């Protein structure tokens, strides 16, 4: 395929694309329910803004439900955008808003743990995009160096 998918022909094509991006973005441990929504059949608004995709996230259980409206632009791009909402930095931002800890401590934890994890996941994902013949098991080798 030479270009991103604008409109999915079948539910299987949609699910296959979602699974491909979930794998390439390193979201293996997330349980995600993907729904392809026909245009104008579901309320796709957030704060009075019409959206091409909506993600309902449970960070604690690493579960998400992602609704994607078919044929509202580059639908494959919407899939990637919605999946990126699952990256760890959003967890830290939520905890910053909800705790009484000193902001310096939260920022240190955010910088040292969450951002590092996010960058590592993204780096692996982009390597897999560049080298499509590898999968996530390729990175299991690096864990041997830490044992």
Regions found by a protein language model. Give the residues of each.
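Polar low-complexity intrinsically disordered regions
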Residues: 1-2, 80
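Active-site recognition of the HExxH zinc-binding catalytic motif
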Residues: 77-90
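Metalloprotease/metallohydrolase-associated module, dominated by Zn2+-dependent proteases
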Residues: 2-74, 90-147
């Amino acid at each position: 395929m030479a270009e991103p998918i604008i409109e999915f022909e079948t539910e299987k094509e949609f699910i296959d694309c979602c699974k491909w991006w979930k794998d390439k973005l390193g979201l293996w441990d997330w349980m995600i329910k993907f729904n392809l929504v026909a245009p104008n059949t579901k309320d796709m608004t957030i704060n009075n803004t019409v959206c091409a995709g909506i993600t309902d996230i449970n960070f604690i259980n690493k579960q998400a439900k992602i609704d994607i409206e078919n044929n509202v632009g580059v639908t494959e791009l919407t899939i990637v955008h919605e999946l990126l909402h699952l990256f760890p930095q959003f967890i830290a931002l939520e905890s910053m808003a909800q705790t009484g800890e000193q902001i310096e401590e939260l920022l240190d934890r955010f910088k040292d743990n969450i951002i590092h994890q996010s960058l590592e996941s993204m780096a692996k994902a982009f390597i897999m995009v560049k080298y499509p013949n590898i999968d996530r098991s390729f990175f299991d080798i690096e864990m041997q160096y830490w044992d």
